[in-house]
UniProtKB/Swiss-Prot annotation:
It is found in: Cytoplasm. It comes from Shouchella clausii (strain KSM-K16) (Alkalihalobacillus clausii). Redox regulated molecular chaperone. Protects both thermally unfolding and oxidatively damaged proteins from irreversible aggregation. Plays an important role in the bacterial defense system toward oxidative stress. Disulfide bonds join C237-C239, C270-C273. GO terms for molecular function: protein folding chaperone; unfolded protein binding. GO terms for cellular component: cytoplasm. Under oxidizing conditions two disulfide bonds are formed involving the reactive cysteines. Under reducing conditions zinc is bound to the reactive cysteines and the protein is inactive. The keyword Disulfide bond applies. The gene is hslO. PANTHER family: 33 KDA CHAPERONIN. This is 33 kDa chaperonin. Keywords: Chaperone, Cytoplasm, Disulfide bond, Redox-active center, Zinc. The keyword Chaperone applies.
Length: 295
């Protein structure tokens, strides 16, 4: 089954609903990062939170999510585009705490319970939109829920989950966001809260083969839902040799000269996809000329 996100409204426009299946997207990101199981869950949950949020954007709009907690995983960074392209990285992929009291991967322990979740949205305007909230649990779904309520003033429920195989590969990954729109009735809110409380973990639903549409129908009641749009979500890294070259130019002439005289070349690795880029001495000299022309 392919990864995709579906958007819907429900209860005659009182509610916005978005759900996604992202197993392959998360699997590819975790493979490239070399994450151990709990880090896979943390990275996957953050990527899906970013992808759900990015599905509300348009055109070439994009956003970056940063979770900076006090746990051993360090920083989690996710870039997500309106197109569905998403990538992510963690500072320390090799964290492996014991299971929590429920026998589950202890994401809160690796993320930490103190710190910030921040979102920067590039909407093609002069200045990006930036919002930041304190981490409330470190479980990530709760933290996105708190972000929507406090930074965007939209009461929401966010569920994101990742199941990991015994061989440490990703078995299933999925997520949803349910948002109350202005004018939502108390009766609607009560019914949705009850339904969400009775819903199995999202990762289990994906493992069982439930589609994003079926997940939304289960959360809100098929008779209440109107589907609007589906589009793919996928792992994609925007790095390239040209971009890395521009980054080297931005270091300045002294740094480039040192690369030439001391190392006779340069090699750099993308933090997101682990692709390696090599620059020969001749290529560095060309970059040096370009850097000098910009002084």
């Amino acid at each position: 089954m392919k990864d995709y996100v579906v958007k819907a409204t429900a209860y005659d426009g009182e509610v916005r609903a978005i759900a996604l299946r992202a197993t392959e997207m998360v699997k590819e990101a975790c493979k490239r990062q070399g994450t151990w199981p709990t880090a896979s869950a943390a990275l996957g949950r953050t990527m899906m939170g970013g992808a759900l949020m990015a599905s509300m954007l348009k055109g070439k709009d994009k956003l970056t999510v940063r979770i900076q907690g006090n746990g051993p995983i360090g920083e989690i960074i996710v870039d997500a585009h309106a197109s569905g392209a998403t990538r992510g990285t963690v500072t320390n992929p090799h964290v492996s705490p014991e299971l929590n009291s429920k026998g589950k991967l202890d994401v809160a322990r690796v993320v930490g319970t103190e710190g910030t979740l921040s979102v920067v949205k590039d909407l093609g305007m002069k200045e990006p939109f930036t919002g930041s909230v304190p981490i409330v649990s470190g479980e990530i779904g709760d933290d996105f829920t708190y972000y929507f309520a406090n930074s965007e003033q939209t009461p929401s429920s966010v569920g994101v989950g990742v199941l990991v195989n015994p061989d440490e590969s990703v078995l299933a990954a999925g997520g949803f966001v349910i948002q109350l729109l202005p004018g939502a009735k108390e009766a609607t809110i009560t019914e949705i809260e009850k339904r969400i409380g009775e819903t199995p973990p999202i990762s289990k639903l994906v493992e069982q083969g439930k589609t994003p549409e079926e997940i939304i129908n289960g959360l809100l009641g098929e008779e209440n839902v109107k589907f609007l749009e589906t589009k793919p979500v996928f792992f994609e890294c925007s790095c390239s040799k040209e971009r890395i070259g521009n980054a080297i130019i931005s270091l300045g002439t002294k740094e480039i000269e040192a690369m030439i005289t001391e190392d006779g070349g340069a090699e750099t690795v993308c933090h997101f996809c682990n692709e390696s880029y090599s620059f020969t001495e001749a290529e560095l000299k060309a970059l040096l000329e370009e850097a000098e022309s910009k002084r």
